[in-house]
Regions:
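Metabolite-binding pocket within alpha/beta catalytic cores that recognizes anionic/polar moieties
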Residues: 2-143
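Expand to "…catalyze enediolate/carbanion chemistry for C-C bond making/breaking, isomerization
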Residues: 88, 210, 218
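Glycine-rich beta-alpha junction loops
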Residues: 101, 162-168, 203, 211
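Active-site rim beta-loop-alpha module in soluble metabolic enzymes
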Residues: 139-190
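A C-terminal functional module that forms or caps the active site or interfaces directly
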Residues: 185-214
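Conserved small/polar residues in nucleotide/adenosyl-binding loops
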Residues: 216-222
Length: 225
């Protein structure tokens, strides 16, 4: 596959405020800027590099390896912008770290969910690929997270997650004019074994595939969806 190029490759990026050399090749992507310093607290020599809009970035090292963390904000549009601009400055590996709502009885609050695919119930990724194009995680990254979960003795699940655009449309579908459609799709996802519901992963997977970077997603269900 030919690597895709952007007109802003190699320059300081407009939204994230970062230039080549500001971040490591490996970047952790939470949504909430408020979680960035908590994650960076596990780094050695962590320094704030930039904070523009929803994109807050720290860079440091972890066990001797350079690593960065950058928030993306909530939802697929801002996530896609962040992934695009990180790819523009040479980042090759991205792991989204976030929270979600559990959709299966066996997926409990506090378990780890490693996404190997995502339901594309959002609009951003269709600006990149037709809806028939699968949103799947990088196999090597999924395997690496599985090994890490095993090594830590964590309870984990690997499978498909649902990505949506509307937070309240999901949590209060009966109040929406399209309630029938929302409820029918929700039932289909549950019966199809979808593990949890969130708002960013399919954009990461589709844009990451297009930009030829390695990517995956680790989520912690914090509620029942």
């Amino acid at each position: 596959m030919t690597e895709k190029k952007s007109m802003l490759d190699g320059e300081k990026q407009y939204h994230i405020g970062l230039a080549p050399g500001d971040v490591a090749d490996f970047v952790i992507l939470p949504g909430d800027p408020g979680r960035v310093e908590f994650i960076a607290g596990h780094f050695d020599d962590a320094k704030e590099i930039a904070f523009n809009r929803e994109y807050k970035t720290f860079t440091g090292t972890y066990k001797g390896r350079p690593v960065s963390v950058m928030s993306t904000g909530m939802g697929c549009p801002s996530t896609a912008i962040g992934v695009e601009e990180l790819a523009n400055i040479g980042v090759k590996t991205m792991v989204r770290l976030g929270t979600s709502g559990a959709m299966q009885e066996h997926t409990r609050v506090g378990d780890l969910v490693i996404a190997n695919g995502a339901v594309r119930q959002e609009g951003t990724s269709t600006e990149y690929m037709p809806i028939e194009y699968p949103a799947v995680g990088s196999a090597d990254m999924v395997f690496a997270l599985e090994q890490a979960a095993k090594d830590k003795g964590s309870t984990y699940h690997i499978g498909v997650v649902q990505t949506k655009d509307s937070f309240y449309g999901q949590h209060d579908p009966d109040s929406m004019p399209v309630s029938y459609d929302l409820n029918q799709k929700w039932e289909a996802w549950v019966r199809g074994g979808v593990l949890c519901s969130e708002m960013e992963v399919s954009a990461l997977f589709v844009v990451g595939s297009y930009r030829t970077v390695s990517y995956t997603h680790l989520t912690l269900p914090t509620s029942l969806a």
